[in-house]
Amino acid sequence: MAAAAAIAASKGNGGGGGRAGAGEASSSRRKKGPGPLTTAYLVIYNVVMTAGWLVIAVGLVRAYLAKGSYHSLYYSIEKPLKFFQTGALLEILHCAIGIVPSSVVLTSIQVMSRVFLIWAVTHSVKEVQSEDSVLLFVIAWTITEIIRYSFYTFSLLNHLPYLIKWARYTLFIVLYPMGVSGELLTIYAALPFVRQAGLYSISLPNKYNFSFDYYAFLILIMISYIPLFPQLYFHMIHQRRKILSHTEEHKKFE
């Protein structure tokens, strides 16, 4: 679910900040880029988000050096992680008002899936916060987002270093499975606590004649990874070949 955000690494088209590709040029969907004010805003947004995820990365390293252990590092970066991941909700607005030519639906799913994992699982089930699986997806997200927002920033400035482009379309090969593994293991670790506490579940009878089993809902989310992960992963592999091979061909003609 949250891992679906990684598809942003391969389906982007436009002006910076949108999860499905803010910052990448699109001749097919938008021949003109955003105006100067919009570009300035998107550059600022992406710079701030890059800096935010760098703060998270530095926080992880400092906590590890201070403790001498990678266990329970989540607590050292909990606040900035929640703040900057929740801040990505603005990317839905960017798509909705048209300053980024990406799908509102797709971007909403991608952003909300991560926000869900942060707030409805990791925040709500305190017992999982010390799990190593949380650190696994946090590290994967952190590296991914630093690269992604840097990519968008430089693209908006029309000065994209090849190294950043290469990293964006290459490191997902490791980071995507790493993030998926961390997400699934975290949800799995939360299941017994959710079931025991009846967290977010609604039982009958009630005046609305409606029931909801959050435990079963989390299981369905985990099952959804089975068809989604290989489909998205191999699509991204295909996109990598196409984009990087095009870059290499372009270099030959320069």
From Swiss-Prot:
Coiled coil, from the record: none
Biased composition (Low complexity): 1-11
GO biological process, one term: very long-chain fatty acid biosynthetic process
Pfam families associated with the record: PTPLA
Protein's membrane topology: Multi-pass membrane protein
Keyword Lipid biosynthesis: yes
Pathway membership: Lipid metabolism; fatty acid biosynthesis
Name of this protein: Very-long-chain (3R)-3-hydroxyacyl-CoA dehydratase 2
Annotated source species: Bos taurus
Gene behind the chain: HACD2
